[in-house]
């Protein structure tokens, strides 16, 4: 299913501008969306991440491999040109292309190519700087996360001379935020 909007109050305007530009470009080129019941089509997902504090933007276009290599190269070059011409408030850190022929509707990385810039961006939380890739588990609302983590510090209480365990630590944001005020912090995460 294709869900689109020209305006959304819960995301930065750059998200909508990128979405509308991408949608218009591929419609002009008559490139179809992926139809999961028929397993046909090219465009699967558009992942857009934007750092609140740094303003850096990372894009990842997830597609099938249902068009030829040369046609795809030309198609993506045109899309890249359009994106880089957009008057965004943020700074484009990277534009990626991920291939995914999986039958599942989830984004599965079956090969990612950097089309522009780098495959990560930086965000800051409570004075700490985090490097975030397209598939990193990281809070999408950085300002809300800061409030949440401040509350976590309050609940944890006095940590001087104590070892703190951050279970299900993900990228380790809570562990890193508690590290300066504890003797030792251990982050535990299972990655399969």
Language model segments and positions:
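Accessory RNA-recognition modules of RNA-modification enzymes
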Residues: 1-192
